[in-house]
Amino acid sequence: MKPNLYICHTAYQVLVDLLRAGRCVGKPHTMVLSASVPDTAALAARLDATGVVKTVLVDETRWPGTVTGLFAHRRAARAFEKLCGWKLNRAAFENVYIHNDWSVLGRYLQDCRAGYILCEDTFGSTLGPDQHLVTDQRTAADFAAKQRGKGYLYWGDSPWCVRVESEDAARCTLFSADRMVTDSKAKLLESLTDDEKAMVRRVFLTQPLPEKADGATLLLPRSFVADGLMTQA
C-alpha cells in the first residue's frame, strides 16, 4: 500500500496524525507541516527521527493570493509550487488528509483536483452546536457555481473532498451519510501503547516533566465541558 499524506497546521493535528500514521502500513508516511506550527524546524527533526513520517515544511505565506480567469486552478497551482517550493504528486499517496481545507494548502489541493479527506481541526469539531461557517457558505449566491469547480469551497463542501471525518459520524448532520466516516480521536488516545506514549514524549517534550506536579493547571483550547466531551469531575 502507498504511504499517506498528512497536512497539519497545529500541534494537535501533528499529534493525532503521527499516531494514526504509526498504525498504518506504508511507513514512512509524508507529513506536511505548515509554518503556522510552532517551532517547525525542530519539531520536524524530531518527527523524522521516529521513522513513522518524513516531513515537508511549507511556508504558505509565500503564496497568499488567488488567481481568476481562464484555467485559474492550474495557474494558481503553478504559482503555489513556484513560491512555496513543494509540488503534490497525488498518485504517490494512498490517502491525503487535511484538517483545514480553507488554508492555502487546502486551496492548493482543490487547484490540483486532488481528492482529499477532511479531518476535524479540533477535537469533535463536527459535533459542535455552531456550524454557521458551513451553513452560511451553502446559502451564498455563488455556492452552486463553486460546487462545479468555479472557485473554492471549504469545511468539506468542495467537490474534491471525498470524505469527511467525525468523532461520531452518526451524530453529525452536516453531510450525507455516504460521505461521513467515524474516526474517534478519543478512542485513539485512550488506546495508546507504552511504545506510542514514549514516541509522543520524544516528539513533544523538549524538557523533562517535573517530578512533582501539585497545583498544575491544564489549559484547554476550547470548552470541552460545554461540548459534553469532558465532565466537571
What positions do the PLM features span?
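A nucleotide-sugar donor-handling region in carbohydrate enzymes
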Residues: 127-217
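A short, charged/proline- and glycine-enriched loop
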Residues: 1-4, 91-93, 209-218, 222-223
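Generic structural motif recognizing short loop/turn segments at the entrances and edges of beta-strands
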Residues: 1-4, 27-29, 51, 170-171, ...
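Short secondary-structure capping micro-motifs at structural edges
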Residues: 84, 206-208, 232-233
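Donor-nucleotide binding loops and adjacent catalytic segments primarily
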Residues: 211-212, 225-233
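Active-site and donor-binding regions of nucleotide-sugar-utilizing enzymes
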Residues: 5-156
